[in-house]
Amino acid sequence: MTNMDLLHKVDMDIVKEVVRICDAHGLKYFMLGGTMLGAVRHGGFIPWDDDIDLGMPREDYEKFLEIAPQELPSHMKTVNYRTDRKFQYYITRVLDTDTKVIEERIGNENKYTNASIDIFPIDGTPNNKFKRKIYFFRVLYHRALMSLCYKDSIDRKRKRSFKEKVLLWVMERIPVNKLTTPYKQKCKIDKLLRSQKVEGSLYIGNIMGAYRTREIVPAEFYGEGKFYPFEDIELRGMADADAYLTFTYGDYMQLPPEDQRKTHFKILEIHGQTVAEE
């Protein structure tokens, strides 16, 4: 088994437990981003992708965070900024503590972590177009400040627009850590996101994903969801996956150039056994 195969197997073990808990408690989840793309284009993982992204409507997300710590197996746990102030992200991860990995895009001691899958809250947005743009600006402003508190973890290899490059250059020269903390910014983001209910919103989604506002889509794309084959199981995804993937990725069936096929994690140890370098 390759390192990637091992990581995929661990990720599948985690996602099966998450789905089991959701099904037992009537909680709704959806595949998001590259996981939804992988299901449609590859019937499972994108071959070079090494994580799974699920989203839950805010109410179900909060219930999951309450229930999961008692129901996950002993070697799995949830972590987010509420349970650990040093946790780098706003979202929740479900970890397999028996599997140690290195998160290669992080440049500090936080890069040593456990195999995991990501759980995102799905929130609404203002229905008024102008108010929605203001809302996006406010959330992304606090997200940028949060990221700049972790300057050694900014993904500098990622493809960015000229405007984004200029903004990053300017903001990197501001002593952000003297003005705020990442925890404060996460709390502000949380307050903004919680203020917008899914019910009644024309556009919903996950602005904290890699594609930011491109992951905010018409609510009917989600609908009640639909099941898609994913490796050896079926997972719930968008009711209209084609519309969602086109909105987010454009020509999603076109494979990206090889230099843009990024991995995030590498297994170092599993069940106490060191994994040999490939």
Each model region followed by its residue ranges:
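Active-site nucleotide-donor binding segment shared across nucleotidyl transfer reactions
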Residues: 19-52, 56, 61-62, 220, ...
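Conserved catalytic core of two-metal-ion nucleotidyltransferases
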Residues: 2-23, 65-127, 146-249, 255-278
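A short secondary-structure junction signal
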Residues: 129-135
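Glycine- and acidic-residue-rich phosphate-binding/metal-coordinating active-site segment common to enzymes
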Residues: 139-143
